[in-house]
Amino acid sequence: PFAGLGSRHNVSHWGCGAKEARISQAAWNRFYYYLTTDERSGNLMTEVRDAEQKLYDIDPMRLALPREKYPCTAPARLRVGPDWLAYVGNWMTEWERTGNTAYRDKIIAGMKSIAALPHGIFTGPGVLGFDPATGVLSYEGDPDLQRTEHLITIMGGFQVMNELMEMIDLPEWNRTWLTFAREYKEKARTITHNPFPVTRLTAYAAAKTGNRELAAEAWDELWHVWHNDKPFTVRRVEVPEVPAPVDENPVVCTNDAATWSLAAIYMQEVIPE
């Protein structure tokens, strides 16, 4: 019943029922496949091309935002990110590998429907209606309700969208994504009180608008907001806490290191000065 989805967690603690598209998405295998032409990696990407069909049966937000509390008439529900963006990566990959424009059209349908929402990507309580047959997203709740979600730009979503907008030039979506990038930080601070830095969005907005003040703000955030004032220490972790003895710095985590590094790479490309 979970074919096409992946298991969230299951590493540092027990897993849960939140099997999600972001874990099994084609974006994870795509570069490896194009570099090596490994056929098994290609199979894995093919297997998830229609993973959104599972949304008819499995709602990724059934526990966090139950449908009874946030009703909608759409046949399924999802978040713009990381859910929809994971599916978009699947469809983009299938389209570029096979030339099947049905997957491109599903992406465009989603882009147009999100752009038409009252507040674009910010619209709603954190979950939107979705039709897996057409790719259209919808919202039937309070038109003034807005929410931010930092997961939109992680798990590959930011990279997928940057590539995709070079493949599909849709003016209304370009405006929607730019608005999202330009306004995210302030809305995250005032609406959801989420301090998680999404530096790449600020950098994107700076690059697209040529705003040097925004560019400086992005670099300042990369160097200072991400900076940890705790002393750099190394501790030895022994068996049985780990399979083999290892040295670790307890203030450095994989998520932060990866996100910071991706931001640094991107910013050197688009706002090098």
Predicted regions and their residues:
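Catalytic cores of extracellular degradative/oxidative enzymes
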Residues: 1-195, 200-270
